[in-house]
A protein has these predicted regions:
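A residue-level detector for short acidic-glycine micro-motifs
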Residues: 55-56, 81
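Conserved active-site neighborhood of the chymotrypsin/trypsin-like protease fold
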Residues: 1-43, 60-64, 119-120, 125-135, ...
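Extracytoplasmic
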Residues: 1-4, 26, 48-53, 59-63, ...
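Conserved beta-strand residues within beta-sheet cores
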Residues: 30, 50, 67, 76, ...
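Catalytic nucleophile loop of clan PA
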Residues: 69-90
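C-terminal cap/linker of serine protease catalytic domains
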Residues: 13-16, 37-38, 86-159
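Short, well-ordered secondary-structure micro-motifs
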Residues: 43-46, 77, 100-101
């Protein structure tokens, strides 16, 4: 089953000023992904992975490939440049078993993300908040973004 949703959280989660800067993805750009992959103990706090943008598809497709690890639970999580700008939102990884069955090899480092220009259309800001552009190390970027990341759990059941 594939699904997408815009989730409105009824509690006050602060917007990270850095995330209000959207940039277009460019092949070769460094990115980090923040999300809640896996099960059990990995749900206690978001994890961070890094990679690059490996391929940008045309604007009509609205997606790009990244080498940042995208696993179950990362879907809907942000991808940021190292200066804290939102470049996309992760949504899928290749089906490794299917790829193995069809191609005879296991793919690695191929996650999909939606381009930030499509996300920007959903989150139109009434006013622009000036943001000083600066490079961060991955640990400090993670700490700055952490208050704005929320875990959403969906329970599927009978109708």
């Amino acid at each position: 089953m594939n699904a997408s949703a815009l989730v409105i959280i009824p509690r006050n989660i602060p917007a990270t000023p850095f995330a209000k800067d959207f940039v277009r993805p460019k092949a070769g750009d460094d990115v980090i992904s923040i999300g809640y992959p896996g099960i059990g103990i990995t749900f206690e706090q978001p994890t961070i992975t890094q990679g690059i943008i490996s391929k940008v598809f045309d604007d009509e497709m609205g997606i790009f490939l990244t080498t940042a690890a995208i696993n179950s639970g990362n879907s809907g999580g942000p991808l940021f440049t190292l200066d804290g700008k939102l470049v996309g939102v992760s949504f899928a990884a290749l089906d490794k078993k299917k790829w193995l069955d069809e191609m005879g090899q296991i793919p690695t480092d191929m996650g999909y993300a939606i381009k930030s220009n499509l996300i920007k259309k959903v989150f139109q800001h009434e006013e622009s908040i000036p943001v000083k552009s600066a490079k961060f190390n991955k640990a400090s970027l993670y700490e700055k973004m952490l208050p704005s990341i929320a875990l959403v759990v969906v329970l599927l059941g009978e109708e």
